[in-house]
Amino acid sequence: MRTGLPSGTAAEVVHPPTGPSPRGLVVIPDIMGMRPLFDDLVARLAIQQGWSVAAFELFPGREDLDVADRLAAGSSLEDDRVLGDAVAAADLTGAETVGILGFCMGGMYVLKAVATGRFDSHCPFYGMIRVPDQWRGAGQGEPLDALAAGDAASVLAVVGAQDAWTPPDHVDELEATGATVLRYAGADHGFVHDPSRPAHRSGDAADAWRRVVDWLAT
């Protein structure tokens, strides 16, 4: 069901067929934001796992931006707004225990969400561990600083060993915080969530999903 967060940001929320669940999940999309791929993911997780699941748009009011424009606009995003929307989405689930996962830029914000203290578990898929130079702005903090301010042990991160957005030295830094990291040999950026992408690796994707769902369920 499409709804709006207090900020006005569009969100999708789905409860399991039995009604609202005591366990919830927030999903932060990749840089391209809300679209049928994520509507389907939210519904699938709600039905298969029995969780109340909410997702929201990263670029509210600018949904028509193409990928090049979104990449260029990364520096205009502010942590206070995005993380405020993440917390509001958690509240929208009505759940007692809430995890969070995200992809690409959304994964970066999952790491930053550690500092909010709102979420019980954090699962970034190929989220940037340091803010890319082209996205640095006055409202952007560093994910590693957020991890230092919260419970880094609540993080299970999924990364591809060939992903230029998460270079090995950054992944080492993430692991040193106490986060658990799953490194997939030969995998590039975006290898899990979108089967239409050339980078998709069905075997690795299935393994990553199994591990992430287990992490969120504990």
Locations of the language-model features?
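Serine-hydrolase catalytic machinery in alpha/beta-hydrolase-like enzymes
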Residues: 1-95, 192-193
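Active-site nucleophile loop of the alpha/beta-hydrolase fold
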Residues: 58, 123-132
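Flexible "cap/lid" loop of the alpha/beta hydrolase fold
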Residues: 65-75, 128-152
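Short beta-strand immediately N-terminal to the catalytic nucleophile in serine-hydrolase-like folds
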Residues: 100-102, 125, 158
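Gly/Ala-rich beta-loop-alpha elbow adjacent to hydrolase catalytic centers
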Residues: 102-106, 110
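Short beta-strand/loop motif that positions the catalytic acidic residue
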Residues: 150-151, 157-159, 163, 184
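Conserved alpha/beta-hydrolase "acid-adjacent" motif
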Residues: 164-170
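C-terminal catalytic histidine-bearing segment of alpha/beta-hydrolase fold enzymes
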Residues: 179-218
